[in-house]
Amino acid sequence: MRLGSGTFATCCVAIEVLGIAVFLRGFFPAPVRSSARAEHGAEPPAPEPSAGASSNWTTLPPPLFSKVVIVLIDALRDDFVFGSKGVKFMPYTTYLVEKGASHSFVAEAKPPTVTMPRIKALMTGSLPGFVDVIRNLNSPALLEDSVIRQAKAAGKRIVFYGDETWVKLFPKHFVEYDGTTSFFVSDYTEVDNNVTRHLDKVLKRGDWDILILHYLGLDHIGHISGPNSPLIGQKLSEMDSVLMKIHTSLQSKERETPLPNLLVLCGDHGMSETGSHGASSTEEVNTPLILISSAFERKPGDIRHPKHVQQTDVAATLAIALGLPIPKDSVGSLLFPVVEGRPMREQLRFLHLNTVQLSKLLQENVPSYEKDPGFEQFKMSERLHGNWIRLYLEEKHSEVLFNLGSKVLRQYLDALKTLSLSLSAQVAQYDIYSMMVGTVVVLEVLTLLLLSVPQALRRKAELEVPLSSPGFSLLFYLVILVLSAVHVIVCTSAESSCYFCGLSWLAAGGVMVLASALLCVIVSVLTNVLVGGNTPRKNPMHPSSRWSELDLLILLGTAGHVLSLGASSFVEEEHQTWYFLVNTLCLALSQETYRNYFLGDDGEPPCGLCVEQGHDGATAAWQDGPGCDVLERDKGHGSPSTSEVLRGREKWMVLASPWLILACCRLLRSLNQTGVQWAHRPDLGHWLTSSDHKAELSVLAALSLLVVFVLVQRGCSPVSKAALALGLLGVYCYRAAIGSVRFPWRPDSKDISKGIIEARFVYVFVLGILFTGTKDLLKSQVIAADFKLKTVGLWEIYSGLVLLAALLFRPHNLPVLAFSLLIQTLMTKFIWKPLRHDAAEITVMHYWFGQAFFYFQGNSNNIATVDISAGFVGLDTYVEIPAVLLTAFGTYAGPVLWASHLVHFLSSETRSGSALSHACFCYALICSIPVFTYIVLVTSLRYHLFIWSVFSPKLLYEGMHLLITAAVCVFFTAMDQTRLTQS
């Protein structure tokens, strides 16, 4: 069976997406879960260690507090309370910590540090995984056991005001609630006022047991202007006033209740130096946790060095405080200072309940639980506890009793710590079988792509895929039988659950058939290669073709990037690798231009994709012999040398272009500091987004939009030009409406809205331009001779994507878009055309620049840099599919725009029937190499110290990038099929 190179590459990438999906499902482990049902009272709590018939405490201890108020301030990092900002802007909170009856901690959140997983950790005590980052966009109902579920089952009345994520996680759990949206980050005032306005009314009432307040304003300020914004201090002062009001009210009501009240101040996650969150930096994982109650002994607190605890400890502590069962999936331990004022017997009882719950969870998730040090400590603690009870029943007051009780306490606390660590470590249990299946599929695809290079890059760009030979069929059925046998053996002997084993036989069989077919094709292609004995050449069609310095740079650069993925520091700072590669590429292009225009060509030019310019377009093809045609001024003239064609100013522009591109890249590096090592350092982006420089940002945004229009409109139809101009004007109006930039005639306007109308105004023009481009492409299939119509159609699709990117980019990132278009223009006019690069080289250059611009946007391999606000531009409610697509495009706009420009360039500047196929194949290959290498690396490094903080987020990025590549290859193939239809 014969397939075009592009179609073949697209099929390979689609299969590779399936393989990486299976690998990701196996790599990100299932969380630790209890098999017991989460119903209140489904089973009685474990009795206290028996010391005779007189000790039979089988009921839950009574609650320690009458009412509990939880004030959760989104993105409240620890130094906002315990640092200089807290002393300055939160004086009442500081007073409570230093002199009041309170216990202060730094609660460490595990990555991913985004809101929904952190709420789950606080209320269930379990450790959410990275898959919760995706679910965070649309939080579904939480089915796990939690403090909220237990409180509702116990008949407690819960009132909630704040982030609507809680309402989605706990539907029908609140007797009263008012949810606020968290996606309009430009709103940091009204979103908190909507919470505070309920306080006076609800505090006067006494018909509730738990009050939860979730304030979003601080998080929104961080997303807008970072942690050093002057707005941070104002918001902290506002929160301090709220805390004082609540605390004063609770104190005044304690005379009416037999038990004291508890006020909890905490954050869900912190805030990075760029104002975002999601990763594992100290600023993102450390949050304050302050427990305030008159039940606590008044003693000075250390505001500078509070004790560090785990965020998962909050669930167990709240459950004990409210007299509820500890959530069954909790891996946290009781914060002992909360109960240290209680009698010794109650303290031991609380600790025993916690260790019993953790030991049960350990038994259900660890086959060899009896050998676990924590379980052994637990059993020893129980025995000592029994001895203490026996002594307690004999004599209630003695020094021996106190000393033994203190020993039991220490033993329980050690057991709690060890059990919690053991259970947390279970999160790192991997589904090796699923990982191996995914790895094998990806390896087979990469091997097939590498073996197909000689055929795929020939002039016809076609491959012979042997599927019907008798040898193929015999090998295929043999491999199917072997894989089926392995699957049965693994799935019937696996001790732990396996995702791939849980699939239906139809789905698992389909994957095995696919893997078998790929292996058979690889064997057939490898046999042909070995029999043919061909050695790799740049041009498989011509034996004398040679490798240029640029080709060697591409090979060495790709290999160097792949090798760098094995080091955590290089993964964190991957942007440096791409900056180095594009800078080196510019220097290599500069050398090539100087050699061509000053030294001249010493011999015939290298063979490859050569451009011939005519007044209706240009042609290019892989040549069968030396002497490629060069750039022509007129179709009817001869083929003068490059130095004869390009003279005067145009020649100097060719020579200067690499250096201009270098200058642009240097400016863009200063715009957004990314990575880890230098992310905290000031950059132009921070300077522009500060409230003191809104005028400068407005001017820069307007100039960038003007440059975008000038560079894009040249290839558009008149209708699309008008739509583009109005759309870019709408982009500025949208940013002005939400308060990011200013209108010249309203410099001091404080009328800030969500910009819904303005954004939808732009969407209309985006869809209109894309529709016009698609219409022209379809028309070009009917009118085969109208080559210009297809060129205009492709450019209009590209223009629509540029307009969409302009809408989604933050104002300070609009220069990134403008410089991207400028560099594409310079490369097209002064480098790719005159220097006669082939399709493979042009494709790799587009890929490299696309990757560099991914990081120029401020992205990194850190989840915290994903701008989720892009997914909600123009939306007044959450709509899942548009939100996900817009967020993905906003994040990967750089690679997508460079890939779409590549399609237009190869379709319009060349008429080679193989150019698009070659480009699609090269694009798939250069993306597949790092994907396979990285999944092998993360498999071997799965127990590395930084596997969750560094390597796992990068793995998610690689998976998403592969999905984007698959979409790009589909577009390549569609355009290539258009060419085949016309021919």
Swiss-Prot record:
- List the ranges whose topology is Lumenal: 1-431
A Pfam family this protein belongs to? Phosphodiest
Superkingdom as given in the UniProt entry: Eukaryota
Q: Which effect does the record note for changing residue 531 to M?
A: In NEDHSCA; uncertain significance
Function field: Catalytic subunit of the ethanolamine phosphate transferase 2 complex that transfers an ethanolamine phosphate (EtNP) from a phosphatidylethanolamine (PE) to the 6-OH position of the second alpha-1,6-linked mannose of a 6-PEtn-alpha-D-Man-(1->2)-alpha-D-Man-(1->6)-2-PEtn-alpha-D-Man-(1->4)-alpha-D-GlcN-(1->6)-(1-radyl,2-acyl-sn-glycero-3-phospho)-2-acyl-inositol (also termed H7) intermediate to generate a 6-PEtn-alpha-D-Man-(1->2)-6-PEtn-alpha-D-Man-(1->6)-2-PEtn-alpha-D-Man-(1->4)-alpha-D-GlcN-(1->6)-(1-radyl,2-acyl-sn-glycero-3-phospho)-2-acyl-inositol (also termed H8) and participates in the eleventh step of the glycosylphosphatidylinositol-anchor biosynthesis.
**Protein family according to the UniProt entry:** Belongs to the PIGG/PIGN/PIGO family. PIGG subfamily.
Write down what this protein is called: GPI ethanolamine phosphate transferase 2, catalytic subunit
